[in-house]
């Protein structure tokens, strides 16, 4: 069974689905049988043991790199009070380093306010049983699911990872600069392929495909509506299902609160990475880069 040589460790909602779909096409890569194996962060997966984990990787006689991408791995500095609520193991970086100390690590980071909003929307999209609902304020959502905020504390979590792995083990990509713009994607993949030790000239298909496209507000309203509400919503003609009236209100106060949490962290991250990030207001714009 092949042992991993690289990991994509996050962040959540920062382009990792697209990145893994590109990496998995490379003929020299043995990828996991699915994108996110959650071995190091979910207790029931961890309990299956190393043999189970390594059995999840495809056999590839030409494989030079073996790995998977679970965005939750970046969140290694976890407040103990969150562990049971989030079903998340502590000290992921230490667990990974204890088993595979020579790994190459790929990190994708997105403006933390935008990432938090996207993470919140993703939980809402999954349905009522996940504890959030459409129109909930950011602060209320964060009180119910602390990971919405905590997973955006990049400096704190990367610092923990860098206690276990040398700087040269990390390739850090910025979503708004390296992943979202179509013009940047080919160069980004060359850097990734070089970092994990496979031929950088490979060109995967679907380079500009969109992954994890956001559900229309109409579809989310149908998911949360009662029986009578669903019947009424189904009378809305398809041409009007994207109408702004069906969208959920913005939460500028909540975004400003997130910014007050994250702004000092962004400055710490810049110091840690030795580069300036143009995340200088509550939301990032692609043309900032």
PLM region descriptions:
Residues 1-289:
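Anion-recognition interface
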